[in-house]
Structure formats: C-alpha cells, structure tokens
C-alpha cells in the first residue's frame, strides 16, 4: 500500500474497489475514497473542490442558456406558451420581458439575449472550473487564505455562511429593482386581462408580510402560497433581501455562540446535509407555489391551475346554458344542490357541481363577477365580458392534468387538448427532486453524526469478494 504523503488529504472511510486507478493524487489510497465517490475525494482539497463547484455551475448555466435558445427556436407566437412545453420562457415573460397586454408575446429578442448571455457566462465558468480542477493550486489555504478554509473552523464557516446570505439577499433585491425601476413585471391582475407594470406601492407592513407565515396551510388560508398581489410579493422580497443581507453581515462579524458550537456538527458532510435539507424545503415550497399560485406563476404563461381549470369549466357551461334560457340561480343539479350555483359552508355563492371543492379559487377572469357575498347573480346575468368567456373556455380545455405520454386535460372533457401543462412538470419535478434532496439530507446527516460520535466504521472490507477478483483494467 502506498504511503500517505499528506495526512490533510486522508479522510477515513474505506471503500476499496479498484486501488490501481490513480488520478493525479486523487486516488483511493490518498483520499480514502474511490473514483466513483466524486467530490468526496476532494473534501480536504479546497482548490480542487472549488474547481468542481465552478464547473458544476458552468454546466447549470450552460443548460439554462442552451435550453433557453432551444425554446426560442421552437417558439410559435400564435400559441400560448403552456401549449408548447416551455418551462424557461414563461419565467422570462413573468419578469416582464417581451410581453404586452394579456400576456401576448410582442418581442422574442430579449429571450434570445438571455440565452446568449447564459451561454457566454457558462463558457467563463467552464474555463474557471477546468482551471481550478486541473491547473490551479490543490489547496487555497497557503496562497489565498481568504478563500481557504478548514471544515472544523467554526468562525470561518459562519463567515462563508454570511457571504452566501448576502448574495441571496442581493438576488432578492434584483427582483425588487426589476419590478420598481427596470420596466416592471407581468401582473396577471392588471385591468382587462393582465399587463406589464411597474410596482410602485410596495407592501412593507410587517403584519401583512409576516402574517402570511402565520396562516394555516389548508384551504381558504393557504399559508404563503395564498399571496395574490404583486405588491405583497415584491414587498416580501424587500423584507427577505434585507433579512438575508443583515443576517449575512451578522454572521461575518460574529463567532458562533457556545450553544451553537455544542448543538451542531461541524464537518463538511454536516454542512452538506444542512444544505440538502434547506434545498428540500425550497423544492416542496416551489412545488406548492407553482401548482396553486396564479399570481407568481401567471396562467397566461404556465396554463391554469387545477382549481382554475375546474372553475373555468363550470363558468363556461353556466354561460352556455344561461344563453339557452336556463335560470342559473335556481336550477337544481342531480344531487338536489344547485346545478350552476350553490352556497359554500360559510354562505358565499359559489359554482355548483364537482367544482364546489375549488370554491377558494381566485383568478383575474372571475373576480370581477364577485360581490360582497361571493358570486353576484346580477353580474353573472348582465356583466360577463367576452374576454372572460374566451379565457375560461381556453383554461377549461387546458387543465394541468396529464401523463408522460401527453394525454392531457380532464379525462371526461371531450374538448381537452393533448398536452401536458408546464405547471404539472414544474410541480412534479420540484416535488420529486425535493424528496430526493430530503433523503440525501437524512443520509448525509446520519453519516456526519456517526462520524462525529466516533462509530463510523464502514463495512469490513478484509474479506470482501471483490478484493480477490481480477481488476477490470
């Protein structure tokens, strides 16, 4: 067995499989990890680990740029975005780029610019990643002490945490500045069916912003996912950005308190588990937001929410049958409840039929027809506008239900379009990835705690069959 020439480079977990495969000192015998353990080989090589992370960022940004350009190349302006399987252009449109009244795309050039900028950025990151992975110093502590670190150094770790928090705060303020000063963002609630507007009257009242956190997560309340005006969303980003930046400064200037030093595990794997746990929470919240919220994720770009498509179907048939002479205020359905309209448990007038369970829905095309006690019968008889009929018919046939083979929409709706809503994709992918990240959090937390407690033995490798087999190479 080769001698360990640097104790700093050895991290004790035995995973002997193929000890002959050496990669410039990043082999199993010098690190304790085989090649397939990936970045675990670099736990104590801050320079190489930097290269791995920068290269990873390059791959992420390359995907964003390439996928962005792919969507631009395939985009058909005459069709809604959600019918074209797009997941990136809706985000750009929501930020107010390239769209006009009603969410109509009037200019695709900003989308092209976005893709090109991401591609160029990915090239810079890719170069930096390759440089630090192959050519740069193995460890940063000696040459660049500011960027160097030891995982056990609690003070340095909280400083790094602080820097990350400040960067997140700056990111939150970028959205604020876009909404306030740089052209505004798309507001699905703008009169007449949505438009891009500057957000001038921010909600900064802490009772409103933090009131969302205290709401019940169940129907009618909906926790933070129930936010339905952009003033609250942008005001929330002012609060969040400020908290992140102030918290970042705090963590840079202070050392961890004694209780934190005792309570937390201070190792690279522990920090990995904390991060995975946080990302899992983000994934679950994003899943709920994209599935239920049609303000942060406007239906013009992402397609209707499930409740929205269901209510749209009830509204469409109310309009049709009312024109054919039905008295929608008193007609009885097959169950004896109102066929078109009924009362909610708390007395509001709501749509009848199966969609009664979605009576919580708020949507820009429906709210003008509500009065102080729910849906207003006189408005339903006299005030329905053509744009509301068109939009509800469109949403009725584009329910965000579907399978991987693209058989989309409500199974019983004969006019449903064969597509899968980006809402389905984004909600499902974030739920699944959030779950995987949560499992990763549990796994790495367990390993980190075991290592800290001193009973991390690994498997006894002395008599493992694979050790007596001929090496693959």
Curated annotation (Swiss-Prot):
Gene Ontology molecular functions: chlorophyll binding; electron transporter, transferring electrons within the cyclic electron transport pathway of photosynthesis activity; metal ion binding
Do you know which InterPro entries this protein is assigned to? PS_antenna-like, PS_II_antenna-like_sf, PSII_PsbC, PSII_PsbC_sf
Gene3D superfamilies with a match to the protein in the record = photosystem ii from thermosynechococcus elongatus
Q: Does the keyword Acetylation apply?
A: yes
Name where it's found: Plastid, Chloroplast thylakoid membrane
Q: Which GO terms describe its cellular component?
A: chloroplast thylakoid membrane; photosystem II
- Residues modified as N-acetylthreonine are 15
Keyword Lyase among UniProt keywords: no
* Cofactor mode of binding and number, as noted: Binds multiple chlorophylls and provides some of the ligands for the Ca-4Mn-5O cluster of the oxygen-evolving complex. It may also provide a ligand for a Cl- that is required for oxygen evolution. PSII binds additional chlorophylls, carotenoids and specific lipids.
- Entry's Gene Ontology BP terms: photosynthetic electron transport in photosystem II
Q: Which residues form the propeptide?
A: 1-14
Annotated membrane topology is: Multi-pass membrane protein
Alphabetic keyword roster? Acetylation, Chlorophyll, Chloroplast, Chromophore, Manganese, Membrane, Metal-binding, Phosphoprotein, Photosynthesis, Photosystem II, Plastid, Thylakoid, Transmembrane, Transmembrane helix
Family note: Belongs to the PsbB/PsbC family. PsbC subfamily.
Report the NCBIfam families cross-referenced here. Answer: psbC
Q: How does it assemble?
A: PSII is composed of 1 copy each of membrane proteins PsbA, PsbB, PsbC, PsbD, PsbE, PsbF, PsbH, PsbI, PsbJ, PsbK, PsbL, PsbM, PsbT, PsbX, PsbY, PsbZ, Psb30/Ycf12, at least 3 peripheral proteins of the oxygen-evolving complex and a large number of cofactors. It forms dimeric complexes.
According to its UniProt entry, the function of this protein is described as: One of the components of the core complex of photosystem II (PSII). It binds chlorophyll and helps catalyze the primary light-induced photochemical processes of PSII. PSII is a light-driven water:plastoquinone oxidoreductase, using light energy to abstract electrons from H(2)O, generating O(2) and a proton gradient subsequently used for ATP formation.
* Protein name per its UniProtKB record: Photosystem II CP43 reaction center protein
